[in-house]
């Protein structure tokens, strides 16, 4: 009955207290893990088994029927007037097995607290619904002189690897007018009258501490691939992995059957991507995205994959010939090969049928070449005919012009010369000189008379 009265008093003090309620947000790592945590360039030879390492212990998931988050809150006191190191005052787990140090305390009910000092039992209280409403405030029924010091409210989340702490300074005074709370720039300072109840506030209503969600529905890992030259926002999804065991495969067909992630990835926190065998077409940027919405974890690891040529294999050692004395005569063993059988590399010729568009393209090239040749031939023929026709007309014009411009004087001179030429050509061979002289007289023509036709024409014109 007395305990219920004190609990009722504690609730009234909680509602009417004028202390400042400080609520801390999500932890620093939880908000800063949205950025890229690592970026590296890896090279693998073509045909090898490529491994892109993506590991995180914060993604390890252990299934529990009670949905135990392994959360604990504990209050510590340091700097008290009694002196000595900091000491644990009280702690409380969300549910399940409770421990102090390495000692097992057994099973406790949800909201059950553990008080370490016998003098503090029944005097220090934590709200039983702390892990449901996020109120982890410490209530002290009657403040004593030894209670003065620096109190720290510590929240641990072993599953999400989170740790948060809040400090409150408690001062005990005999003056009721000095009682109150203020902020000194780093922490809350609470002054309480001796013998009066005190409420040290510690409030954190983040869902990770209030058990409002199930982690198996909010824990996912996925791999993305960016071909060379493709931005991050247009990456192709390769794999989706869920803590519930569901898996989804995407990506191009030539890569989908060669990528895999181990089946126990969530049990070990190892989500490395295996590509077996890796090919030159697999080059690009691969991203490993780790999302734990319950714990507030968002990480991305980037890998730039380069595929190199496979290393040249060393030539096989020469086989021992039968005549060098290194081989022994006898029947061949069961694993010996027949030397008459030679094994060569098999070559497969693949004939890819050409499309109809390719056929018409080649036909167009042939027709265009033929048309160009015909046009060139016609041009040559026309040019030749035009040249011949022009030469014939030129010769006709030249002959006509020569026939019109005949000089009569030159004609006369030419006629006289022609007669002389003819007389000189006559060759007579006679037996005596008398006959020769007679023949010359008979055949000799009268001397040519030069007539100037121009003068004759002028004479006729003057008459």
Swiss-Prot record:
<dbReference type="GO" id="GO:0030154">
    <property type="term" value="P:cell differentiation"/>
</dbReference>
<comment type="subunit">
    <text>Homodimer in cis. Does not appear to form trans-homodimers. Interacts with ITGB3; the interaction inhibits ITGAV:ITGB3 heterodimer formation.</text>
</comment>
<keyword id="KW-1133">Transmembrane helix</keyword>
<dbReference type="InterPro" id="IPR003599">
    <property type="entry name" value="Ig_sub"/>
</dbReference>
<dbReference type="GO" id="GO:0007155">
    <property type="term" value="P:cell adhesion"/>
</dbReference>
<feature type="short sequence motif" description="RGD">
    <location>
        <begin position="268"/>
        <end position="270"/>
    </location>
</feature>
<keyword id="KW-0966">Cell projection</keyword>
<feature type="transmembrane region" description="Helical">
    <location>
        <begin position="363"/>
        <end position="383"/>
    </location>
</feature>
<keyword id="KW-0597">Phosphoprotein</keyword>
<keyword id="KW-0677">Repeat</keyword>
<keyword id="KW-0472">Membrane</keyword>
<feature type="domain" description="Ig-like V-type 1">
    <location>
        <begin position="29"/>
        <end position="173"/>
    </location>
</feature>
<feature type="modified residue" description="Phosphoserine">
    <location>
        <position position="244"/>
    </location>
</feature>
<dbReference type="Pfam" id="PF07686">
    <property type="entry name" value="V-set"/>
</dbReference>
<comment type="function">
    <text>Transmembrane protein which can modulate activity of various signaling pathways, probably via binding to integrin ITGAV:ITGB3. Mediates heterophilic cell-cell interactions in vitro. Inhibits osteoclastogenesis downstream of TNFSF11/RANKL and CSF1, where it may function by attenuating signaling via integrin ITGB3 and MAP kinase p38. Plays a role in cartilage formation where it promotes proliferation and maturation of growth plate chondrocytes. Stimulates formation of primary cilia in chondrocytes.</text>
</comment>
<keyword id="KW-0393">Immunoglobulin domain</keyword>
<keyword id="KW-0965">Cell junction</keyword>
<feature type="topological domain" description="Cytoplasmic">
    <location>
        <begin position="384"/>
        <end position="463"/>
    </location>
</feature>
<feature type="topological domain" description="Extracellular">
    <location>
        <begin position="20"/>
        <end position="362"/>
    </location>
</feature>
<feature type="disulfide bond">
    <location>
        <begin position="202"/>
        <end position="288"/>
    </location>
</feature>
<keyword id="KW-1003">Cell membrane</keyword>
<protein>
    <recommendedName>
        <fullName>Matrix remodeling-associated protein 8</fullName>
    </recommendedName>
</protein>
<feature type="glycosylation site" description="N-linked (GlcNAc...) asparagine">
    <location>
        <position position="324"/>
    </location>
</feature>
<feature type="signal peptide">
    <location>
        <begin position="1"/>
        <end position="19"/>
    </location>
</feature>
<dbReference type="InterPro" id="IPR013106">
    <property type="entry name" value="Ig_V-set"/>
</dbReference>
<feature type="compositionally biased region" description="Low complexity">
    <location>
        <begin position="321"/>
        <end position="335"/>
    </location>
</feature>
<feature type="domain" description="Ig-like V-type 2">
    <location>
        <begin position="176"/>
        <end position="308"/>
    </location>
</feature>
<feature type="region of interest" description="Disordered">
    <location>
        <begin position="309"/>
        <end position="341"/>
    </location>
</feature>
<dbReference type="GO" id="GO:0005737">
    <property type="term" value="C:cytoplasm"/>
</dbReference>
<feature type="glycosylation site" description="N-linked (GlcNAc...) asparagine">
    <location>
        <position position="135"/>
    </location>
</feature>
<dbReference type="GO" id="GO:0005634">
    <property type="term" value="C:nucleus"/>
</dbReference>
<dbReference type="GO" id="GO:0005923">
    <property type="term" value="C:bicellular tight junction"/>
</dbReference>
<dbReference type="InterPro" id="IPR042472">
    <property type="entry name" value="MXRA8"/>
</dbReference>
<feature type="disulfide bond">
    <location>
        <begin position="54"/>
        <end position="153"/>
    </location>
</feature>
<feature type="site" description="Cleavage">
    <location>
        <begin position="346"/>
        <end position="347"/>
    </location>
</feature>
<keyword id="KW-0539">Nucleus</keyword>
<dbReference type="InterPro" id="IPR007110">
    <property type="entry name" value="Ig-like_dom"/>
</dbReference>
<dbReference type="InterPro" id="IPR036179">
    <property type="entry name" value="Ig-like_dom_sf"/>
</dbReference>
<dbReference type="InterPro" id="IPR013783">
    <property type="entry name" value="Ig-like_fold"/>
</dbReference>
<keyword id="KW-0130">Cell adhesion</keyword>
<dbReference type="GO" id="GO:0009986">
    <property type="term" value="C:cell surface"/>
</dbReference>
<keyword id="KW-0325">Glycoprotein</keyword>
């Amino acid at each position: 009955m007395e305990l219920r009265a004190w609990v009722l008093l504690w609730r009234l003090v909680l509602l009417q207290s004028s202390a400042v309620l400080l609520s801390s947000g999500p932890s620093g790592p939880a908000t800063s893990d949205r950025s890229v945590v690592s970026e590296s360039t890896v090279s693998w030879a073509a045909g090898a088994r490529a491994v892109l390492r993506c590991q995180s212990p914060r993604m390890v998931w252990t299934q529990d029927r009670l949905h135990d988050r392994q959360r604990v809150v504990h209050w510590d006191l340091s700097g008290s007037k009694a002196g000595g190191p900091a000491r644990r005052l009280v702690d409380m787990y969300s549910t399940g097995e409770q421990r102090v140090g390495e000692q097992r305390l057994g099973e406790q009910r949800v909201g059950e607290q553990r008080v370490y000092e016998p003098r503090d039992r029944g005097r220090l209280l934590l709200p039983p619904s702390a892990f449901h409403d996020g109120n982890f405030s410490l209530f002290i029924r009657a403040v004593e002189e030894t209670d003065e010091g620096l109190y720290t409210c510590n929240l641990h989340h072993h599953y999400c690897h989170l740790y948060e702490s809040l400090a409150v300074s408690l001062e005990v005074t005999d003056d009721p007018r000095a009682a109150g709370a203020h902020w000194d720039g780093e922490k809350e300072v609470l002054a309480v009258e001796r013998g009066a109840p005190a409420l040290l506030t510690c409030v954190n209503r983040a869902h990770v501490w209030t058990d409002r969600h199930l982690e198996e529905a909010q824990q996912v890992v996925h791999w993305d691939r960016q071909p060379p030259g493709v931005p991050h926002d247009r990456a192709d999804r390769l794999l989706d992995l869920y803590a519930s065991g569901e898996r989804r495969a995407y990506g191009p067909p030539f890569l989908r059957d060669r990528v895999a992630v181990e089946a126990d990835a969530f049990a070990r926190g190892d989500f490395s991507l295996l590509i077996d065998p890796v090919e030159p077409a697999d080059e690009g940027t691969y991203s490993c995205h780790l999302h734990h919405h319950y714990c507030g974890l968002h990480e991305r690891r980037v890998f730039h994959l380069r595929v190199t040529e496979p290393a040249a294999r060393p030539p096989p050692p020469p086989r021992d010939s039968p005549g060098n004395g290194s081989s022994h005569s006898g029947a061949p063993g069961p694993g010996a090969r027949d030397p008459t059988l030679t094994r060569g590399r098999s070559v497969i010729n693949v004939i890819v049928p050409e499309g109809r568009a390719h056929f018409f393209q080649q036909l167009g090239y042939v027709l265009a070449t033929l048309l160009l040749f015909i046009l060139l031939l016609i041009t040559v023929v026309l040019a030749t005919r035009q040249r011949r026709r022009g030469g014939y007309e030129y010769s006709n014009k030249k002959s006509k012009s020569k026939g019109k411009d005949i000089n009569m004087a030159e004609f006369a001179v030419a006629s006289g010369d022609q007669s002389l030429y003819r007389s000189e050509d006559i060759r007579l061979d006679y037996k005596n000189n008398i006959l020769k002289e007679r023949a010359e007289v008979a055949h000799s023509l009268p001397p040519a008379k030069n007539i100037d036709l121009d003068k004759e024409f002028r004479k006729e014109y003057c008459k």
